[in-house]
Each structure stands twice: as structure tokens, then as C-alpha cells.
Amino acid sequence: MAKKGMINRELKREKTVAKYAAKRAELKATIANVNATDEERFDAMLKLQALPRNASPVRLRNRCGLTGRPHGYFRKFGLSRNKLRDTVMQGDVPGVVKASW
């Protein structure tokens, strides 16, 4: 089980990313716009750099929904490999069966 502080930190990052998503997209569009003047693009770059670091979606980490474990994460299920195995063996995940050949 991950520390509660780490899980809370990740939730805080998710909220920050959602809060600044529109502003980041607008600034990035201005920077990528070829028709914008150099001054506008430079100002947009400075404003983008002034945003909080945790506003960038790159800083998010996928974590297990049950334990908060950051490694061995399966996106399709939202669980780590350990908890995925446990839930599949209990029959809690529909459509998943143990491999047999």
C-alpha cells in the first residue's frame, strides 16, 4: 500500500492539471501558431513557464485504484498486477480467465 501522502499528492496534481488544462492548451496553440508575431509567441512561452509545474499532465503517474501502487499498472483495469491477479482469481473482473493451453 502506498503512503497516503503520495496518493493525496497525486490527486492534488490531477486537480491542478484539470484546472490549468484550458489555459495551457491556449498558450501552446499561440506558441505553435505560425501567423503569431514573435513577441506574442515569446509572451506565451513566458506565461506557460510561469504556470505551476504540476499543471503539466506529464507529471501525473498512473496508480492502482486499490493500493496506490505506481508500478505494474494495467490501464485497462486501473489496477496493479498484484491486485488484478487477486480480483481475477476471485472472479470480480468479468470476462477475464486464467490462461490455459
UniProtKB/Swiss-Prot annotation:
Pfam families in the record: Ribosomal_S14
UniProt-listed InterPro entries: Ribosomal_uS14, Ribosomal_uS14_bac/plastid, Ribosomal_uS14_CS
Keywords from the named record: Ribonucleoprotein, Ribosomal protein, RNA-binding, rRNA-binding
Gene Ontology biological process terms in this record: translation
Molecular functions per Gene Ontology: rRNA binding; structural constituent of ribosome
Any single GO CC term annotated in Swiss-Prot or TrEMBL for this entry: cytoplasm
Family annotation (PANTHER family): 30S RIBOSOMAL PROTEIN S14, SMALL RIBOSOMAL SUBUNIT PROTEIN US14M
Function: Binds 16S rRNA, required for the assembly of 30S particles and may also be responsible for determining the conformation of the 16S rRNA at the A site.
Subunit structure: Part of the 30S ribosomal subunit. Contacts proteins S3 and S10.
Assigned protein family: Belongs to the universal ribosomal protein uS14 family.
Protein's recorded name: Small ribosomal subunit protein uS14
UniProt lineage: Bacteria, Pseudomonadati, Pseudomonadota, Gammaproteobacteria, Moraxellales
